[in-house]
Design a protein with these regions (language model features):
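Hydrophobic cores of alpha-helical transmembrane segments in multi-pass inner/ER membrane proteins
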Residues: 78-84, 140-158
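Individual transmembrane alpha-helix segments
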Residues: 42-80
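N-terminal signal-anchor transmembrane alpha helix
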Residues: 1-26, 181-191
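Juxtamembrane "helix-exit" motif on the non-cytosolic side of transmembrane helices
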Residues: 119-127
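Transmembrane helix-loop-helix
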Residues: 77, 81-108
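Interfacial segments of alpha-helical transmembrane regions
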Residues: 1, 98-107, 164-184
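Non-cytosolic membrane-interface motifs at loop->transmembrane helix junctions
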Residues: 128-140
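Long, glycine/tryptophan/cysteine-rich extracytoplasmic
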Residues: 25-47
Length: 191
């Protein structure tokens, strides 16, 4: 869901509509006209508005704002819904020791993903009308890495095995190569 929301945020050119990274205070959207005017005036200061969207009104701005807002809220929720169960199940001993380091690595990647997301947005706030494609591809790569690691761990748990993530075997060369090519093709979509 998050990758789809991120993709739609990009396709609707909504990613630069929120020009500040308010990690804790940005949880609520603007609730009155004054707050909307504040966010809209901040958007008016960036090149995307000045060069492309200078005829945009506040109602049109609200549409792109909500795409980016939902993307950020969903990211926060994913982080929270991963963090608290992880701590709880680790504390009561329900996570197999073989998987605990992978779980915490996924948590760190989720946090890093948020930081990279803001780093990506910053690239589009000055001198550009879009974000850096390199930063976008990094953001997308981390998303696919997180999803792949979670999927891999689910398969390990279902099959009661512990196989290392991205373990290379000569007899799996074609499969590994195919996965690599698909991954590269997806990342090239950022360009």
């Amino acid at each position: 869901v998050m990758i789809a929301v991120g993709g739609l945020t990009r396709l609707t050119d909504s990613g630069l509509s929120i020009t500040e990274w308010e990690l804790f205070t940005g949880i609520l959207p603007p609730l009155n006209n004054e707050a909307w005017e504040k966010y809209f005036s901040l958007y008016k200061e960036i090149p995307q508005y000045q060069l492309i969207n200078n005829d945009m009104n506040i109602e049109e701005f609200k549409i792109i704002f909500y795409w980016e807002y939902f993307h950020r809220i969903l990211g926060r929720l994913i982080g929270i819904f991963f963090l608290f169960p992880l701590i709880y199940f680790h504390f009561i001993g329900k996570i197999n020791n073989k998987h605990i380091s992978t779980c915490y690595l996924i948590l760190l990647l989720i946090i890093f993903q948020g930081i990279v997301g803001w780093y990506m947005v910053k690239s589009g706030l000055v001198n550009n009308i879009t974000v850096s494609h390199y930063r976008l591809s990094l953001h997308l790569s981390i998303a696919f890495l997180i999803i792949s690691m979670i999927f891999w761990m689910i398969l390990n748990i279902q099959n009661n095995t512990f196989k290392k993530f991205l373990k290379y075997k000569k007899d799996n060369f074609f499969f590994n190569f195919l996965v690599f090519v698909i991954f590269v093709q997806i990342i090239l979509g950022a360009f």
